[in-house]
Amino acid sequence: MKIWVDADACPKVIRETIVRAAERTSVECTFVANHVVPVPRRPNIHSLQVPAGFDIADNEIVKRVEPNDLVITSDIPLADEVITKGGLALSSRGELYTKDTIKARLNIRDFMETMRSSGIQTGGPAALSQTERREFANHLDRILAKR
């Protein structure tokens, strides 16, 4: 198992949690973004900078992910592609996407996109709560314990 992080929009506190878990378990972890993502110098922790552009980081993750790899992302279409390839997808808010839940999440995302494109203000996501941080860390620990 490897961990791939869609780091373009990953909160710093979640990146720090991922690094600690990767260090503790010696799992290889790669942060993929279109900008420099500072990561500690460890043999199993890497940063991959891709060119700027729409979905370039996502496409790079999809290209590299293998069955049973874990992808940390809040990007619903990326999570869907990862699950289709046999990987695991966990949001930075602690939601583990599954084959059973991803289609509903895609439908909600598409509906919200339609509303935004028609001029309706939908607002952004709320700030990351302590509960969500804990939920993320707990899910991550459970996934890494099963590998």
From Swiss-Prot:
It comes from the Bacteria. Pfam families: DUF188. Belongs to the UPF0178 family. NCBIfam families: PRK00124.1. This is UPF0178 protein VV2566. It comes from Vibrio vulnificus (strain YJ016). The lineage of its organism: Bacteria, Pseudomonadati, Pseudomonadota, Gammaproteobacteria, Vibrionales.
